[in-house]
Protein backbone atom coordinates (compact mmCIF):
# COMPACT_ATOMS: atom_id res chain seq x y z
CA UNK A 1 0.00 0.00 0.00
CA UNK A 2 0.96 3.63 -0.26
CA UNK A 3 2.34 5.05 2.96
CA UNK A 4 0.56 7.75 4.97
CA UNK A 5 2.94 10.54 3.89
CA UNK A 6 2.30 9.84 0.21
CA UNK A 7 -1.46 9.61 0.77
CA UNK A 8 -1.50 12.98 2.55
CA UNK A 9 0.57 14.52 -0.24
CA UNK A 10 -1.89 13.17 -2.82
CA UNK A 11 -4.88 14.56 -0.95
CA UNK A 12 -3.18 17.93 -0.51
CA UNK A 13 -2.24 18.07 -4.18
CA UNK A 14 -5.51 16.94 -5.78
CA UNK A 15 -8.38 17.57 -3.38
CA UNK A 16 -9.66 20.92 -2.16
CA UNK A 17 -9.45 21.69 1.54
CA UNK A 18 -13.24 21.49 1.88
CA UNK A 19 -13.29 17.97 0.40
CA UNK A 20 -10.32 16.62 2.35
CA UNK A 21 -12.30 14.92 5.11
CA UNK A 22 -14.62 13.22 2.60
CA UNK A 23 -11.78 12.23 0.27
CA UNK A 24 -9.96 10.01 2.77
CA UNK A 25 -12.64 7.28 3.01
CA UNK A 26 -13.17 7.44 -0.77
CA UNK A 27 -9.44 6.90 -1.33
CA UNK A 28 -9.36 4.08 1.22
CA UNK A 29 -12.15 2.25 -0.65
CA UNK A 30 -10.49 2.87 -3.98
CA UNK A 31 -7.13 1.57 -2.76
CA UNK A 32 -8.65 -1.80 -1.84
CA UNK A 33 -9.23 -2.65 -5.48
CA UNK A 34 -11.71 -2.14 -8.29
CA UNK A 35 -14.96 -0.68 -7.00
CA UNK A 36 -18.01 1.14 -8.38
CA UNK A 37 -18.91 4.66 -7.37
CA UNK A 38 -22.19 3.33 -5.89
CA UNK A 39 -20.28 0.84 -3.72
CA UNK A 40 -18.01 3.61 -2.47
CA UNK A 41 -21.05 5.73 -1.66
CA UNK A 42 -22.62 2.86 0.31
CA UNK A 43 -19.43 2.00 2.21
CA UNK A 44 -18.58 5.60 3.09
CA UNK A 45 -22.14 6.85 3.68
CA UNK A 46 -21.33 9.81 1.43
CA UNK A 47 -23.71 11.15 -1.19
CA UNK A 48 -23.08 9.72 -4.64
CA UNK A 49 -22.48 13.16 -6.17
CA UNK A 50 -19.75 13.90 -3.58
CA UNK A 51 -18.09 10.54 -4.26
CA UNK A 52 -18.20 11.16 -8.00
CA UNK A 53 -16.77 14.68 -7.63
CA UNK A 54 -13.81 13.29 -5.68
CA UNK A 55 -13.35 10.41 -8.13
CA UNK A 56 -13.30 12.79 -11.09
CA UNK A 57 -10.71 14.99 -9.36
CA UNK A 58 -8.55 11.89 -8.90
CA UNK A 59 -9.18 10.92 -12.52
CA UNK A 60 -8.22 14.41 -13.76
CA UNK A 61 -4.99 14.13 -11.76
CA UNK A 62 -4.31 10.77 -13.42
CA UNK A 63 -4.32 8.72 -10.22
CA UNK A 64 -7.62 6.94 -10.82
CA UNK A 65 -9.11 5.33 -13.89
CA UNK A 66 -12.50 3.88 -14.67
CA UNK A 67 -14.15 1.38 -16.94
CA UNK A 68 -17.68 1.99 -18.14
CA UNK A 69 -19.98 -0.98 -18.65
CA UNK A 70 -23.67 -1.22 -19.47
CA UNK A 71 -26.00 -3.26 -17.28
CA UNK A 72 -27.88 -5.59 -19.66
CA UNK A 73 -31.04 -5.51 -17.52
CA UNK A 74 -31.38 -1.81 -16.71
CA UNK A 75 -29.38 -0.44 -19.66
CA UNK A 76 -27.70 1.92 -17.18
CA UNK A 77 -23.96 2.50 -17.22
CA UNK A 78 -21.86 1.35 -14.29
CA UNK A 79 -18.47 2.92 -13.63
CA UNK A 80 -15.87 0.69 -12.05
CA UNK A 81 -12.99 2.68 -10.62
CA UNK A 82 -9.39 1.68 -10.08
CA UNK A 83 -6.60 3.39 -8.18
CA UNK A 84 -3.32 3.96 -10.08
CA UNK A 85 -0.59 3.97 -7.39
CA UNK A 86 2.32 4.33 -9.80
CA UNK A 87 0.78 7.56 -11.11
CA UNK A 88 0.68 8.96 -7.56
CA UNK A 89 4.40 8.47 -7.20
CA UNK A 90 5.07 10.13 -10.56
CA UNK A 91 2.80 13.07 -9.75
CA UNK A 92 4.38 13.70 -6.36
CA UNK A 93 7.92 13.37 -7.72
CA UNK A 94 7.06 15.88 -10.47
CA UNK A 95 5.61 18.32 -7.95
CA UNK A 96 8.60 18.00 -5.63
CA UNK A 97 11.02 18.47 -8.53
CA UNK A 98 9.19 21.67 -9.44
CA UNK A 99 9.38 22.91 -5.84
CA UNK A 100 13.11 22.11 -5.68
CA UNK A 101 13.68 23.92 -8.98
CA UNK A 102 11.86 27.04 -7.72
CA UNK A 103 13.72 26.96 -4.40
CA UNK A 104 17.05 26.74 -6.21
CA UNK A 105 16.08 29.71 -8.38
CA UNK A 106 15.07 31.71 -5.30
CA UNK A 107 18.32 30.77 -3.56
CA UNK A 108 20.37 31.84 -6.56
CA UNK A 109 18.48 35.15 -6.73
CA UNK A 110 19.02 35.84 -3.03
CA UNK A 111 22.71 34.88 -3.14
CA UNK A 112 23.46 36.92 -6.26
CA UNK A 113 21.76 40.16 -5.26
CA UNK A 114 22.16 42.90 -2.69
CA UNK A 115 18.91 44.23 -1.24
CA UNK A 116 17.67 47.53 0.13
CA UNK A 117 14.44 48.08 2.04
CA UNK A 118 12.23 51.00 2.96
CA UNK A 119 12.65 51.73 6.68
CA UNK A 120 8.84 51.79 6.94
CA UNK A 121 8.54 48.31 5.43
CA UNK A 122 6.96 49.28 2.12
CA UNK A 123 9.33 47.79 -0.45
CA UNK A 124 12.34 45.56 -0.91
CA UNK A 125 14.54 46.33 -3.90
CA UNK A 126 17.60 44.81 -5.51
CA UNK A 127 20.59 47.13 -5.74
CA UNK A 128 19.79 47.98 -9.38
CA UNK A 129 16.15 48.75 -8.56
CA UNK A 130 17.13 50.84 -5.52
CA UNK A 131 19.58 52.78 -7.69
CA UNK A 132 16.77 53.62 -10.12
CA UNK A 133 14.76 54.99 -7.18
CA UNK A 134 17.78 56.92 -5.80
CA UNK A 135 17.56 54.74 -2.66
CA UNK A 136 14.27 56.46 -1.78
CA UNK A 137 10.99 54.63 -1.18
CA UNK A 138 8.56 55.50 -3.98
CA UNK A 139 5.62 55.24 -1.56
CA UNK A 140 6.70 57.29 1.47
CA UNK A 141 9.92 59.01 0.39
CA UNK A 142 12.00 57.45 3.18
CA UNK A 143 15.60 56.48 2.57
CA UNK A 144 16.28 52.82 1.91
CA UNK A 145 18.68 50.80 4.04
CA UNK A 146 20.84 47.83 3.18
CA UNK A 147 19.15 44.55 4.08
CA UNK A 148 21.12 41.54 5.23
CA UNK A 149 19.34 38.61 3.58
CA UNK A 150 21.45 35.86 5.17
CA UNK A 151 18.43 34.65 7.21
CA UNK A 152 16.33 34.37 4.04
CA UNK A 153 19.15 32.46 2.35
CA UNK A 154 19.39 30.07 5.30
CA UNK A 155 15.60 29.52 5.34
CA UNK A 156 15.62 28.66 1.64
CA UNK A 157 18.58 26.30 2.14
CA UNK A 158 16.78 24.60 5.04
CA UNK A 159 13.58 24.16 3.03
CA UNK A 160 15.56 22.95 0.03
CA UNK A 161 17.32 20.42 2.23
CA UNK A 162 13.96 19.12 3.48
CA UNK A 163 12.70 18.56 -0.05
CA UNK A 164 15.95 17.05 -1.29
CA UNK A 165 16.25 14.67 1.66
CA UNK A 166 12.62 13.67 2.23
CA UNK A 167 12.86 10.34 0.45
CA UNK A 168 10.43 11.01 -2.39
CA UNK A 169 13.02 9.62 -4.77
CA UNK A 170 12.57 6.30 -3.05
CA UNK A 171 8.78 6.19 -2.64
CA UNK A 172 7.65 2.64 -2.47
CA UNK A 173 4.21 1.47 -3.47
CA UNK A 174 2.98 -2.05 -3.73
CA UNK A 175 0.51 -3.25 -6.27
CA UNK A 176 -3.10 -2.67 -5.33
CA UNK A 177 -5.55 -5.50 -5.97
CA UNK A 178 -6.44 -5.46 -9.66
Curated annotation (Swiss-Prot):
Molecular function (GO) terms for this protein are: DNA binding
Q: Name one Pfam family in it.
A: TFIIE_alpha
GO biological process terms on file: regulation of DNA-templated transcription; transcription initiation at RNA polymerase II promoter
Transmembrane spans? none
Q: Which InterPro entries match?
A: TF_E_archaea, TFE, TFIIE/TFIIEa_HTH, TFIIE_asu, TFIIEa/SarR/Rpc3_HTH_dom, WH-like_DNA-bd_sf, WH_DNA-bd_sf
Per the UniProt entry, the effect of residue 137 to A is: Loss of function
Described by its record, this protein's role is as follows: Transcription factor that plays a role in the activation of archaeal genes transcribed by RNA polymerase. Facilitates transcription initiation by enhancing TATA-box recognition by TATA-box-binding protein (Tbp), and transcription factor B (Tfb) and RNA polymerase recruitment. Not absolutely required for transcription in vitro, but particularly important in cases where Tbp or Tfb function is not optimal. It dynamically alters the nucleic acid-binding properties of RNA polymerases by stabilizing the initiation complex and destabilizing elongation complexes.
> Which family is this protein grouped under?
Belongs to the TFE family.
Record's protein name: Transcription factor E
Organism of origin is: Methanothermobacter thermautotrophicus (strain ATCC 29096 / DSM 1053 / JCM 10044 / NBRC 100330 / Delta H) (Methanobacterium thermoautotrophicum)
Q: What gene name does this entry carry?
A: tfe
